[in-house]
Amino acid sequence: MNLKDNINSKISLIIGITFAVFIDLILSKLMANWSYSWLPVQASKAAPYVDNLFAFETGIGTFIFLGCSGVIGWVLLFNRAPKYDESYGEPIEGNVKLEIVWTLVPLFLVIAIAIYSTKVNTTLQNLGEKTKYDSQKELPTYLDNNEASAGRFIDVISRQWSWEFKYPEGFSSSELHIPINEKVYFRLISKDVIHGFYIPAFRLKQDIIPGSIISYSLTPTRKGIYRLRDSMFSGAYFSQNQTNVIVESKDAYQEWINKTVKKVQVDGLNQAGFLYKKRLEKGDKGWATIPPAPPPLVNDPGDPDSPHEG
């Protein structure tokens, strides 16, 4: 091969690689945009930041996957040995340029992901302050120092396997009602084991630790009915430990408070109790499990059959 052919070959290789990288970037961008549709609706101020990070990581993952798959496919298609050729390949080993590339590229990607993730985590922390108290003795001090929010806490009480929400107005509910576009303050409390306070539409997942109180705040931004799930394996019926989260206008929220505070308390929502009763009727067979905690008394048991948006 003469010099001219060698130069043309290198130019063709560079053009081919550039075109392949360009196509990879386009497909990665399309996949990143598509990833938004895989997630539930965005219903809190935190949701867009989490979704953007997810899309960013999806795009990077797609670029790496397609790039590696493309190289493997190219080698399989165009660098195979001729038919019936059983000779050994050339003993090629070591390529400093290639080793530098495959060291620097992952390093750059990891640093980029770390910087972006840290930025998102900082933003989420600013949007929803979170503090863990190891004993209830520390809570009064916090409330004294934060009088503006002291009367706005909604106590989220988790049990095996039911949810209870106690409001500052002195009543409780099995469903969580909150006003749109207003910061809502929670105190997360567990009565038995570790539970997970998980609302996919809010992009919120917080462990609830027994013996501790965790204060948390968020701002819902979209009206609708969403789903609160127990994301921790808290026992046999943890998957049934779900309830609705209702985001409504300020007027509708206040109207619900005025009605609910006058209601007589009844047993709260407890799907696990129903399932455990059926188990006993069948002879209590299968893996051993503890009985569900008695349902809490609430002013509004809610409607478990209401349609929700994830």
What are these model-predicted stretches?
Residues 3-7, 28-54, 76-310:
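Non-transmembrane, membrane-proximal soluble domains of secreted or membrane proteins
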Residues 9-11:
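Polytopic transmembrane helical bundles with strong interfacial aromatic enrichment
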Residues 13-36, 63-70:
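Alpha-helical transmembrane segments of integral membrane proteins, especially early/N-terminal helices
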Residues 53-67:
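Alpha-helical transmembrane segments
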Residues 68-78:
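Central hydrophobic cores of alpha-helical transmembrane segments in multi-pass inner-membrane proteins
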